[in-house]
Swiss-Prot record:
GO terms for molecular function: ATP binding; pantetheine-phosphate adenylyltransferase activity. Its cofactor is Mg(2+). Substrate binds at S9, K41, L73, K87. Pathway: Cofactor biosynthesis; coenzyme A biosynthesis; CoA from (R)-pantothenate: step 4/5. InterPro entries: Cyt_trans-like, PPAT, Rossmann-like_a/b/a_fold. Belongs to the bacterial CoaD family. NCBIfam families: coaD_prev_kdtB, cyt_tran_rel. This is Phosphopantetheine adenylyltransferase.
Length: 161
């Protein structure tokens, strides 16, 4: 059995992320989306909210599950008996950073990283950009799953009060 991890903060999950998850699920027997906890970053959504949004958005992928994790990604991968990391790439800048991480993960743990070129429709999409545009009243409904978009709007309304 082959298995892979799709790591990230997913604050919130975007359609670009879902594209990568679906493509990974088509290539691997088991895929775990790892919602990584960074104690130095305060997210808009809690880790539990992010996990719930991803689960709702990936319910049609039976070989995919969602977990949280912290610490070294390769430890997360090894503890679950998996053998690969899948990362989406939007730009050459993404590649430069992710290649260094992939080489380090291979060096310290022998874990391979597979890069998936983001679909052109999502090449500009990021969680940060979606949040920023939505904060100023811009329409980001085409960038997020519908339920995630509604949650984002709810968070922003709550902050305005």
């Amino acid at each position: 059995m082959t298995g892979a991890v799709c790591p990230g903060s997913f604050d919130p999950v975007t359609l670009g992320h879902l594209d990568v998850f679906e493509r990974a699920a088509a290539q691997f027997d088991e895929v775990i989306v790892a919602v990584l906890i960074n104690p130095n970053k305060a997210g808009m959504f809690t880790v539990d909210e992010r996990i719930e949004m991803i689960r709702e958005s990936t319910a049609d992928l039976p070989n995919l599950r969602v977990e949280s994790g912290q610490g070294l990604l390769v430890d997360f991968v090894r503890e679950r008996g998996l053998n690969a990391i899948v990362k989406g790439l939007r730009t050459g800048t993404d590649f430069e950073y992710e290649l260094q991480m992939a080489q380090m993960n291979k060096h310290i743990a022998g874990v391979d990283t597979f890069f998936v070129a983001t679909a052109p429709a999502y090449s500009f999409v990021s969680s940060s950009l979606a949040k920023e545009v939505a904060t100023y009243g811009g329409d980001v409904s085409a960038l997020l799953p519908a339920s995630v978009h509604q949650r984002l709007l709810g968070k922003l309304r709550g902050q305005a009060q």
